[in-house]
Amino acid sequence: METTEDVAVHLSERLSVTVAEITVRSLARSLEHWEKSPTKVATVMFKVHPSCVQEKPAGDQWYIPAMGNNRTCRRLILDTHFRGLTPLNDSSHLQTSYDCIAISGLASHPFGSWQPKGDDKEFMWILDKLAHGEQSVRAILFGYDTKLKDSTSFQGIRDLAKHLIDQLQANRGPKCETPLAFLAHSLGGLVVKQALVDLAKNRFDIGYQILRDAIRGAIFFGVPSQGMEVSAWKAIVQGQPNEIMINALSSTSDFIPKLTKAFNETLPEHCRFFWAYETEVTPTAITEPDGQVARKGEAVKLVSEDSATCGFIKSDPGVTIPINKSHSDMVKFCEGSQYYAIVRASLWQVLQPTLLQPDDTDYDAQYLLSRHVESNNRKAFEFITTQHDWWAKSRTP
């Protein structure tokens, strides 16, 4: 399948949905490079639920059998969870290519977290601006499960970081040197920082070294380098196994200071980072009478400017980005957002610092962080349903 039109026709035949009710938003080669017959991954929006979903509406992944006796036709996988790595495009072979990994935050959806709130789900900036607009950048979503209510998971940030490393190593290939950068929101940024620390500590592992050398840096959005306000979340997860995760995010936790210190000490010299911070309060999460979790509680500042910028708002504001949105909304850029151009320019400074900065200026990330440390020593596919549309991811032969 070579075009989005091909995918729409194929899905129509396999799912008994008319082509007019299917919108294929992206098509990319699967990251599973070891396959003899490579598959492709598409992000798709349906105007009506396919019958397989209607039969099992509580699911988040469905298998559609192959058609007849055609051996070239594989079983189709449809999912709305987007867990693991999901490529949104293929980078151009005509120029130097880069990978950009987008990682959402706590209790988030890998795709929906980057979309504006509301019924209109036509726009998602990482797909529609980054993936479709930058031919040399391959945009990839990293999804993981950190739901709050009724969770049975006791995974921690170290576990998530190890899973991120495992996914990147497995899907990029053992000798892949394609430069990569991260767009990371909230908890996602702590996962990236822990992964970088772990890559540095295992310096004798060749695979870890190759991956570490490929990483160019990140743009962090509201990442709590000094902890964050978690009292509302604590009330929701009290007594659950995932309580350990929420406690680790607290401003009184000893985990984050240790992670920040280790990150500062092991940071690769070739990396560069930008730090975005929210400037609006955020409604806290509450449990409603029907048992659903909703952001309808008291509005508070979840992550302070100092915490979100690792202190650079005072020591080097040039690497900080103020975003006049709440903690949740700060990555939900609408179409035409004033912030995309800023993030795009910052991303290219991460990916191509030598092309964008004067040769005689030291923009070394280690230098920036060491200044902050010295200063401190002198005084730290959602199941997206709307009235009209439904998003999903499809793997096609």
Label every PLM stretch briefly.
Residues 3-23:
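Short alpha-helical elements within RNA-binding folds
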Residues 131-147:
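Conserved alpha/beta-hydrolase
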Residues 38, 176, 233, 266-397:
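C-terminal catalytic-base region of ester-bond hydrolases, centering on the histidine
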Residues 83-136, 199:
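Short, surface-exposed "cap/lid" segments of acyl-processing enzymes
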Residues 104, 158-268:
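Serine-dependent carboxylesterase/thioesterase catalytic core
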Residues 19-38:
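RNA-recognition motif
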